[in-house]
Amino acid sequence: MLAKRIIACLDVDDGVVVKGIKFQNHKIVGDIVPLARRYAKEGIDELVFYDITAATKNKLVDRSWIKNVSKVINIPFCVAGGIKSVEDAKKVLSSGADKISINSSALIDPNLITKISERFGVQCVVIGIDSWFDKTKNSYMVQQYTGDISKTYQTSWKTSDWVKKVQEKGAGEIVLNMMNKDGLQKGYDISHLSEIRKICKVPLIASGGAGSVEHFYEALYYSNVDGVLAASVFHKNIVEIKVLKKKLIARGMEIREC
């Protein structure tokens, strides 16, 4: 059995790490490289960096900090932000990232997933999906350009249908960002995760809502996700990585020890 992954998420805006609630009202958390070094030292399995405004500003993520991060950590890390072509993906990967993640650009051109996965392998192609429960439609819908509230809008894609589509196109992994839960620290959306798990044949990562050790356990156990991603609880030291792993292992989870 493959070990479940504990992943720290670092949202990047103008060269610093930020964090908001439900993808809004972001506040500065700290500098990129020191935080990356800290998490690697504390025993995190993987890091994910989202340049949250790169796509809306029509620019590629700044590669200088990617190179700097690669020099100070020895764990896998994924980078997202304005990747719109195979050449963009090449630039990010050649700067030191182990994986690239695309979101809005995949919604614009789903074939981009295929092009990148065929060039570099499915193992380094992650699809981020920003899912919001629309009460009027009584369905989870995919949101686009979520890095800028003034440009965010709801697509015509139901989350479940988009999950199927990106797998057909060559996604190697899916990060399901549950926007209704983001930053609230009240737990992951277990029901939504469990439904997506049924149709997701590639590694599935839960994102949005972690506030305690129990929340991580619930997502791993009840929804059988392959990894759990969090930001606020790690940034604010609400949950210590070493303690989290120790408690999950004690409850029978296959987790890499610190």
From Swiss-Prot:
Enzyme Commission code: 4.3.2.10
Keyword Lyase: yes
Top-rank taxon: Bacteria
Pfam families: His_biosynth
Pathway, per record: Amino-acid biosynthesis; L-histidine biosynthesis; L-histidine from 5-phospho-alpha-D-ribose 1-diphosphate: step 5/9
InterPro entries found in the cross-reference section: Aldolase_TIM, His_biosynth, HisF, IGPS_HisA/HisF, RibuloseP-bd_barrel
Catalytic activity: 5-[(5-phospho-1-deoxy-D-ribulos-1-ylimino)methylamino]-1-(5-phospho-beta-D-ribosyl)imidazole-4-carboxamide + L-glutamine = D-erythro-1-(imidazol-4-yl)glycerol 3-phosphate + 5-amino-1-(5-phospho-beta-D-ribosyl)imidazole-4-carboxamide + L-glutamate + H(+)
Subcellular location: Cytoplasm
Keywords: Amino-acid biosynthesis, Cytoplasm, Histidine biosynthesis, Lyase
GO biological process: L-histidine biosynthetic process
Top-level class of the enzyme under EC nomenclature: lyase
Gene Ontology CC terms: cytoplasm
Lyase keyword on record: yes
Annotated active site: D11, D130
GO molecular function: imidazoleglycerol-phosphate synthase activity; lyase activity
SUPFAM superfamilies, alphabetized: Ribulose-phoshate binding barrel (SSF51366)
Role this protein plays: IGPS catalyzes the conversion of PRFAR and glutamine to IGP, AICAR and glutamate. The HisF subunit catalyzes the cyclization activity that produces IGP and AICAR from PRFAR using the ammonia provided by the HisH subunit.
Similarity annotation: Belongs to the HisA/HisF family.
Subunit-level organization: Heterodimer of HisH and HisF.
NCBIfam families, per database record: hisF
Protein name as catalogued: Imidazole glycerol phosphate synthase subunit HisF
Gene: hisF
